[in-house]
């Protein structure tokens, strides 16, 4: 796949399979996986977009799955599903840390396993998918990455 650094290019097929998505514009994936410590074209703007798309997708999924829930319960459930810890767990599931481009200092200090960096990268990947092919593709990827977590009983979702 072109548009990716060699390190990402070699692992892209595996990462795409885990993500359940192949980028039409692989440079977006490269930027989504680039921490600000690594270069000027980093993932923070993608993270911003991914956060918004993620909140929308999870809110809609909760409303559909739990029509009996009140707004306060829905808000608490959404907060539990989009927080740093949950996003870091999802990032670990698809091994984002192995594909991150980090500056030397961040790499040496264990940045590839730091929950905040993993969570931010997960949001950035969601944002990159949205920029690559739009909302429907981003929704499909988010639902796929979350898997059965979005389908858990209401009590389990609220306990997160």
Region locations from a protein language model:
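Double-stranded RNA-binding/processing signature
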Residues: 1-160
């Amino acid at each position: 796949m072109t548009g990716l650094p060699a390190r990402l290019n070699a692992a892209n097929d595996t990462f795409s399979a885990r993500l359940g998505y192949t980028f039409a514009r692989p440079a977006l994936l490269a930027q989504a996986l680039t921490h600000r410590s690594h270069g000027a074209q980093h993932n923070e703007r993608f993270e911003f977009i991914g956060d918004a798309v993620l909140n929308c997708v999870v809110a809609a999924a909760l409303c559909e799955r739990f029509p009996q829930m009140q707004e306060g319960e829905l808000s608490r459930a959404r907060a539990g599903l989009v927080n740093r810890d949950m996003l870091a767990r999802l990032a670990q599931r698809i091994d984002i840390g192995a594909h991150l481009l980090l500056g030397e200092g961040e790499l040496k200090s264990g940045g590839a396993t730091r929950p905040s960096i993993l969570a931010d990268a997960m949001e950035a990947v969601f944002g990159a998918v949205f920029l690559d092919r739009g909302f429907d593709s981003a929704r499909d990827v988010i639902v796929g990455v979350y898997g059965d977590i979005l389908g858990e009983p209401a009590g389990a979702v609220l306990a997160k």
